[in-house]
Amino acid sequence: MTTSGALFPSLVPGSRGSSTKYLVEFRAGKMSLKGTTVTPDKRKGLVYIQQTDDSLIHFCWKDRTSGTVEDDLIIFPDDCEFKRVPQCPSGRVYVLKFKAGSKRLFFWMQEPKTDQDEEHCRKVNECLNNPPMPGTLGASGSSGHELSALGGEGGLQSLLGNMSHSQLMQLIGPAGLGGLGGLGALTGPGLASLLGSSGPPASSSSSSSRSQSAAVTPSSTTSSARATPAPSAPAAASATSPSPAPSSGNGTSTAASPTQPIQLSDLQSILATMNVPAGPGGSQQVDLASVLTPEIMAPILANADVQERLLPYLPSGESLPQTAEEIQNTLTSPQFQQALGMFSAALASGQLGPLMCQFGLPAEAVEAANKGDVEAFAKAMQNNAKSDPKEGDTKDKKDEEEDMSLD
């Protein structure tokens, strides 16, 4: 079963439950991609979209005969697009195409009438890219408590203290960057102070199963169809494989339940409604996105040593080769540039110092982050990188010491 997990697993037992009412559902079969051709799976299936109690949107496909859910993908706004494949002779083949990366899922309509096909397509895109606000569907679970409960030290500290480094990074990603500059607006001690006083994050394991990411502009296209007839099933369609791109990882962590019914969606809602203020003292902010342009990064990324250090951070997968080209595509994508600009603005707010402590950054970098000095932060990180001995140097030194001990 192909399952894409959330980056932030719920910390509240039972909060991953879902409402029994689907946002959209229609009968449709799967199609398998083999090489550049898609062929229909004759099983009876059901495509449905549901919003779970943690406010996440799931795109699912299940076998109507066995009841087995084979695909359960967590989709975020602007991750993907559901559209008809015009090259298919039957006109009833649709593809869930992810905007960042090469992943595509094909389906063929099994509803007896065709008059609702386009309406189903419209509803799918509406639910995936404009999901309903939490609580508007009347689902039980997270809507029962108020956001103000997050202001208490016990709730927030329990929530944040049990996050892994990768999970904390989500807070400075596009989904949660809206309000890092206004952290002081939280009631109680504030998120920044809680980050500084919270314990080390729990251990976590991650995998790259989430289908979409802030990665690279896709270049995929669908070519003309070629027929391979099947009874009551669409003809197979030929598709040109796009250049693969990274997909963001999803993390799972093992953590104790907080003392209050705290949901991460509440925290993200607070962060998303805050505004990043101007730099301290009215000083001019440094926009990292305008500094780290593709032209400037090109000669750096051409360095084999740099490529070797960056390759391990690319997501792994069957259709996601870890190549130097993928590094180039990722770092020059509009999504990455947008995330870089948002991180730059949040860093300039002077509120990220405690968060930087969580990552074990040098004191100079933490101090610069507390001051909102982006330039000083960059210099501190550069100096720290220069001071760290290279792996080869460390090995040579160790060998030399062993030789001396033998003498």
UniProtKB/Swiss-Prot annotation:
Region described as Interaction with UCHL5: spans on this chain: 362-407
Chain positions found as Phosphoserine: S15, S140, S211, S405
Region ranges (Disordered): 130-150, 196-259, 381-407
Listed Low complexity bias regions: 137-150, 196-248
CDD domains in UniProt: PH_Rpn13
UniProt domain DEUBAD: residue ranges: 277-391
Chain positions with N-acetylthreonine modification: T2
Expressing tissues: Widely expressed.
Domain Pru: 18-131
Ranges in a coiled coil: none
Superkingdom classification of source: Eukaryota
Bias (Polar residues): 249-259
Extent of Basic and acidic residues compositional bias: 387-398
Molecular-function GO terms, alphabetical: endopeptidase activator activity; molecular function inhibitor activity; protease binding; proteasome binding
List of residues that carry Phosphothreonine: T217
Keywords: Acetylation, Cytoplasm, Isopeptide bond, Nucleus, Phosphoprotein, Proteasome, Ubl conjugation
GO biological process: adipose tissue development; follicle-stimulating hormone signaling pathway; oogenesis; ovarian follicle development; positive regulation of growth hormone receptor signaling pathway; proteasome assembly; regulation of T cell differentiation in thymus; seminiferous tubule development
Role summary: Component of the 26S proteasome, a multiprotein complex involved in the ATP-dependent degradation of ubiquitinated proteins. This complex plays a key role in the maintenance of protein homeostasis by removing misfolded or damaged proteins, which could impair cellular functions, and by removing proteins whose functions are no longer required. Therefore, the proteasome participates in numerous cellular processes, including cell cycle progression, apoptosis, or DNA damage repair. Within the complex, functions as a proteasomal ubiquitin receptor.
Domain remarks: The Pru (pleckstrin-like receptor for ubiquitin) domain mediates interactions with PSMD1 and ubiquitin. Preferential binding to the proximal subunit of 'Lys-48'-linked diubiquitin allows UCHL5 access to the distal subunit.
Assembly and binders: Component of the 19S proteasome regulatory particle complex. The 26S proteasome consists of a 20S core particle (CP) and two 19S regulatory subunits (RP). Interacts with the proteasomal scaffolding protein PSMD1. Interacts with deubiquitinase UCHL5; this interaction activates the auto-inhibited UCHL5 by deoligomerizing it. Interacts with UBQLN2 and ubiquitin.
UniProt similarity note: Belongs to the ADRM1 family.
Listed name of the protein: Proteasomal ubiquitin receptor ADRM1
Source organism per UniProt: Rattus norvegicus
